[in-house]
Amino acid sequence: MAPSVPLVLLLVLLLSLAETPASAPAHQGRGGWTLNSAGYLLGPVLHLPQMGDQDRKRETALEILDLWKAIDGLPYSHPLQPSKRNVMEAFAKPEIGDLDVLSKKIPKEEDVLKS
């Protein structure tokens, strides 16, 4: 059984339109996704503005960079603001015990003002 003429023409057309790696335009320059030596996928290079009047753009760029790092599970470039619980945990001593015991031993504001 011989293939039909329209089918042969369609195959010839599709094969002629297919791009080979040699004929595809290559992206020159920086800014694409790449793999580092450990095999991790790295995002595009982020060029931060250096002028003083572009602080807002710089902060936005740093927020985007933090978002990329958060997606990849990497630490943030800006330290996060500590919550009250983190501050209390930082000052809790091991001999005091847990935070519930710590909060019971702290005098209340009204008691201090009365004395």
From Swiss-Prot:
Give the UniProt tissue specificity note: Hypothalamus and pituitary gland.
User: Any one Gene Ontology biological process term?
Assistant: regulation of appetite
What are the entry keywords? Antibiotic, Antimicrobial, Cleavage on pair of basic residues, Hormone, Neuropeptide, Secreted, Signal
A molecular function (GO) term: hormone activity
Instruction: Using the record, list the residue span of the signal peptide; answer none if the entry has no such feature.
Output: 1-23
Q: Which residues form the propeptide?
A: 86-115
* Subcellular location(s) per record: Secreted
A Pfam match: Galanin
Q: What GO CC annotations are associated with the protein? A: extracellular region
Give the chief site where it resides: secreted
Q: Which InterPro entries match?
A: Galanin, GALP
Q: Which family does it belong to?
A: Belongs to the galanin family.
Tell me what this protein is called: Galanin-like peptide
Q: Which species is this UniProt entry from? A: Macaca nemestrina
